[in-house]
Amino acid sequence: MQLEHCLSPSIMLSKKFLNVSSSYPHSGGSELVLHDHPIISTTDNLERSSPLKKITRGMTNQSDTDNFPDSKDSPGDVQRSKLSPVLDGVSELRHSFDGSAADRYLLSQSSQPQSAATAPSAMFPYPGQHGPAHPAFSIGSPSRYMAHHPVITNGAYNSLLSNSSPQGYPTAGYPYPQQYGHSYQGAPFYQFSSTQPGLVPGKAQVYLCNRPLWLKFHRHQTEMIITKQGRRMFPFLSFNISGLDPTAHYNIFVDVILADPNHWRFQGGKWVPCGKADTNVQGNRVYMHPDSPNTGAHWMRQEISFGKLKLTNNKGASNNNGQMVVLQSLHKYQPRLHVVEVNEDGTEDTSQPGRVQTFTFPETQFIAVTAYQNTDITQLKIDHNPFAKGFRDNYDTIYTGCDMDRLTPSPNDSPRSQIVPGARYAMAGSFLQDQFVSNYAKARFHPGAGAGPGPGTDRSVPHTNGLLSPQQAEDPGAPSPQRWFVTPANNRLDFAASAYDTATDFAGNAATLLSYAAAGVKALPLQAAGCTGRPLGYYADPSGWGARSPPQYCGTKSGSVLPCWPNSAAAAARMAGANPYLGEEAEGLAAERSPLPPGAAEDAKPKDLSDSSWIETPSSIKSIDSSDSGIYEQAKRRRISPADTPVSESSSPLKSEVLAQRDCEKNCAKDISGYYGFYSHS
């Protein structure tokens, strides 16, 4: 009972004050607006209000519209609010509708109405360009209109922030944004009379669907590429529209106009004006949506996307292609959306102002460029545009700076700790420069997620020519030098000099190096003639190596060198024939799988340089001379030839520096029996 007692006043308030006057001739539109958005109003105030008028405001964040009566009606409203406590309840309900204070949204009305001829049309947060406005009807006394999406309405509803009177007729000029200290008046898009007080504009509301993405670019001043062939916009324009007559027919199109009178250039890491814009450019500036003309029900049913709109600097493109919008480089532009009601035969009638509506979203401003200037914009395009592979592959060669200090990092940025699998691979400072660890893709360390730049994968900079580059598998013949990630001479996988313990040393290092192999990476099979064919992986078998008897490996004694390993050229040839993935590298395979303890390497003498020139590398590196398709990418090792051995891929200065520091002539044959003793006894 108490709950009903508390709710009944608010229910009665909603019934009394959520009514739209039936005296308005366009009742169908009012019902549609009432259905879509909550409107709080009184009905008796319409009788004594001056002729039809309305002021609305399109907001950028929390969108709402405040309708105010004429200034001469304000004392009456104050008196009625004193007499009736019900109105106070309405005011409280209206002020706390979205849980915000009233002073955040409600702006006081100017007591000195401006002249109708000088009141410009304004739009939050920038002044906008619209056609001449006309008096629209007022639903009643001070009320508020709450919308739950970013909304910028027609020019006829945007005079609140410019302090124009409710009866004001905003001029047709375009007050451009004042943030750079310039004011520029442009011509209206539609020329029609502004002296028809009986006509009422439509109440269409337009929502910018991908507004969060636009705002992210707008923070750094959006740039759009223009080419001779035409380049599509990204982000593209995508809208949702409501409030149209479902049975009427409309043309919806976009035009692109100059946003200010300046010519711009990128200097000192920011855009600065330099001279006046060229306003005498000829060319198409309008892009009609392919679905035009169509019914209001069609336009309101789905998202209206302009993804096929192309920007070009070819002035002759307008002669043969309606999809091209001709722009000039280094000029700032503002796209506008136009909704025009047409006749049944498709002809436009712009003599009636209610048929033409223009919508402008300031966050869609951009500067036309022939090449991206701001690296922040480049990074955002890489992160969000699925078709940015063209310059994503070459990003590290153009922009080699560190991306870790960017203001807008990619959501898929990997931390620096993922570049090196663990503390065991502590690198010298010269090997781990900032330009090599820039924004490395997470997918490179998780093969199950896919490493390619195809749709549906994490998109980031693959660093084709950078550090830890697995892209070499796609282009094994790339002539550019590779920067190989190698371990220091005293830190060869940090194997202990005393013993090889499966649980502590070998398994620990292998798990650190190949911690993601469980996602589907196969081990390198090491089968040869006379063996069982069971592959020897880099990990301990789940059943344990100790469970296998020595006779399993060709019946050899524990601690001795296995005869099935290729210690001769004939055995190497047999192994290469049995396993095509080894090929010419089978010759030094035994030495590859026998890392030396640091103590044993001191007194070793060189026996065969070809057997001693293998060094351990992280599994994410793909060897240049490898021909496999990536299945064994994480399992192969990189063979580094000595400095005096001429090889085709030894052109990297970084590699030569490393080889000079290492003693490449250490022999690992002494410890080979101890190495295989690990497989037999552990």
Curated annotation (Swiss-Prot):
The modification Phosphoserine is found at S410, S594, S641. Residues 108-122, 619-629 have a biased composition (Low complexity). Changing K389E: In IDDAS; de novo variant; localizes to the nucleus but forms abnormal aggregates; no effect on transcriptional repression of FEZF2; does not affect homodimerization; severely decreased interaction with FOXP2; loss of interaction with FOXP1; does not affect interaction with BCL11A. PROSITE patterns: TBOX_1 (PS01283), TBOX_2 (PS01264), TBOX_3 (PS50252). InterPro entries: p53-like_TF_DNA-bd_sf, T-box_assoc, T-box_DNA-bd, T-box_sf, TF_T-box, TF_T-box_CS. It is found in: Nucleus. GO terms for biological process: amygdala development; brain development; cell fate specification; cerebral cortex development; chromatin remodeling; commitment of neuronal cell to specific neuron type in forebrain; conditioned taste aversion; gene expression. The modification Phosphothreonine is found at T408. Changing P542R: In IDDAS; uncertain significance; does not affect nuclear localization; no effect on transcriptional repression of FEZF2; does not affect homodimerization; does not affect interaction with FOXP2; does not affect interaction with BCL11A. Pfam families: T-box (PF00907), T-box_assoc (PF16176). Residues 213-393 bind DNA. Changing Q418R: In IDDAS; uncertain significance; does not affect nuclear localization; no effect on transcriptional repression of FEZF2; does not affect homodimerization; decreased interaction with FOXP2; loss of interaction with BCL11A. Homodimer. Part of a complex containing CASK, TBR1 and TSPYL2; may modulate gene expression in response to neuronal synaptic activity. Interacts with FOXP2. Interacts with FOXP1. Interacts with BCL11A. Residues 43-83, 108-127, 447-483, 588-658 are annotated as: Disordered. Residues 58-68, 462-472 have a biased composition (Polar residues). Keywords: Autism spectrum disorder, Disease variant, DNA-binding, Intellectual disability, Nucleus, Phosphoprotein, Transcription, Transcription regulation. Its main location: nucleus. One of its GO terms (cellular component) is chromatin. CDD domains: T-box_TBR1. Transmembrane segments: none annotated. It comes from Homo sapiens (Human). GO terms for molecular function: chromatin DNA binding; DNA-binding transcription factor activity; DNA-binding transcription factor activity, RNA polymerase II-specific; protein kinase binding; RNA polymerase II cis-regulatory region sequence-specific DNA binding. Transcriptional repressor involved in multiple aspects of cortical development, including neuronal migration, laminar and areal identity, and axonal projection. As transcriptional repressor of FEZF2, it blocks the formation of the corticospinal (CS) tract from layer 6 projection neurons, thereby restricting the origin of CS axons specifically to layer 5 neurons. It is linked to Intellectual developmental disorder with autism and speech delay: An autosomal dominant neurodevelopmental disorder characterized by varying degrees of intellectual disability, autism spectrum disorder, and language deficits. Brain. This is T-box brain protein 1. SUPFAM superfamilies: p53-like transcription factors.
